[in-house]
Amino acid sequence: MALINDNYLKLKAGYLFPEIGRRVRAFAEANPSAKVIRLGIGDVTRPLAPAVLKAFHAAVDDLGTTDNFAGYGPEQGYDWLINAIIEKSYKPLGVSLKTDEMFISDGSKCDCANILDIFALDNVVAIGDPVYPVYNDTNVMIGRTGEADDKGYYKGIVYMPCNEENHFIPSLPTEKVDIIYLCFPNNPTGTVASRAELKKWVDYANANDAVIFFDAAYEAFITDPEIPHSIYEIEGAKKCAIEFRSFSKTAGFTGVRCGLVVVPEEVMGTTSTGERYSFNKLWLRRTTTKFNGASYPVQRAAEAVYSDEGWKQTKEIIDYYMENARIIREGMKEAGLTVYGGVNAPYIWLKTPAGMTSWDFFDKLLTECNVVGTPGSGFGPSGEGYFRLSAFGHRENVIEAVERIKKNLK
């Protein structure tokens, strides 16, 4: 008799974005003439930068020649890509990394889930609320939690409320925790953390022998020079933090798939017998066993992002999305809504009007404005009464969506 993993049955509902897709499809089928504008899921719309596309094509051509053919590559990623990232993305921040401390993957969503393989189940995990659903759901799936209560909180996870009172930046937990998820710039709230705020977390982690999972998927969208792009800009972070980055939004790789994890050699854990052991070694062992590496053409395309031409073109695309964010942010303010984010992040986090629930506002925008956003409650109980809009649309659609919402709410 084949038994299932019963932990999956603890999940309260379907993953947020498929549920949004289901509702939108049902509306579109019932209203075939409606022009639905999607500002919900954070998928990109701009094409790859020309320099990146050129490198992609050249790498595919390599596979058609005997001399340049590439088969299995190193599971950790090619050194030429890792070194390009370190030189162009970390050294300018004053961060020194070794080649074997970085791992190339097929995306940070997978990494945020897979990293749990090397941590014991009895670790106490702390996550923000609202939060990117993957952090919560993957801990449920592997069996770290009990059942969810009526609010949706799972027994065994420490939830850190992020609200207007704390400017959507969680406070240090009052109890001791072992793993801390931080995401800045934040998804879904669009907020960022200062050096002083991050230093509090690093100090807490080092004092409590905890590990920070730092999701920096949106660091390329930071416009304020005072805001850190990496947790490793903070003194002491290389002893306690694992950082995740993604090419999905930075370079438009949502359909290409490439990400990276930094696991410094100094980040240590404790065995069941009390000995200290490097998480870097564990992650390398896990990677070489369960992953064959990102594809050669994808890594060549990623490398091209860091060329002078590639980065200039990539930055232009990022600027395009951030102009969309400005348009949405200002438009929602003109509509009389309370708005957060959209300055150092491609997400706008707004309060729903007149005390509406998040899903009621979703249905209102869908049926009355034909605009799709993301209900804040889908990111956790503290997201109730909020709503996320994404800046990753086409400019003309963003402008039209904003005008529709303004007209409807005024």
UniProtKB/Swiss-Prot annotation:
Pfam families in UniProt: Aminotran_1_2
EC number: 2.6.1.83
Cofactor: pyridoxal 5'-phosphate
Binding of pyridoxal 5'-phosphate, residues: 72, 108-109, 132, 187, 218, 246-248, 257, 292
First-tier enzyme category under EC: transferase
GO MF annotations, alphabetized: L,L-diaminopimelate aminotransferase activity; pyridoxal phosphate binding
Catalytic activity: (2S,6S)-2,6-diaminopimelate + 2-oxoglutarate = (S)-2,3,4,5-tetrahydrodipicolinate + L-glutamate + H2O + H(+)
GO terms for biological process, alphabetical: lysine biosynthetic process via diaminopimelate
Domain of life: Bacteria
Keywords from the named record: Aminotransferase, Pyridoxal phosphate, Transferase
Keyword hit for Transferase: yes
Biochemical pathway: Amino-acid biosynthesis; L-lysine biosynthesis via DAP pathway; LL-2,6-diaminopimelate from (S)-tetrahydrodipicolinate (aminotransferase route): step 1/1
Positions where N6-(pyridoxal phosphate)lysine occurs in the chain: 249
Keyword rRNA processing: no
Residues that coordinate or bind substrate: 15, 42, 109, 132, 187, 292, 388
InterPro entries: Aminotransferase_I/II_large, DapL/ALD1, PyrdxlP-dep_Trfase, PyrdxlP-dep_Trfase_major, PyrdxlP-dep_Trfase_small
PANTHER family: AMINOTRANSFERASE
Quaternary data: Homodimer.
Similarity field: Belongs to the class-I pyridoxal-phosphate-dependent aminotransferase family. LL-diaminopimelate aminotransferase subfamily.
Known function: Involved in the synthesis of meso-diaminopimelate (m-DAP or DL-DAP), required for both lysine and peptidoglycan biosynthesis. Catalyzes the direct conversion of tetrahydrodipicolinate to LL-diaminopimelate.
Protein name: LL-diaminopimelate aminotransferase
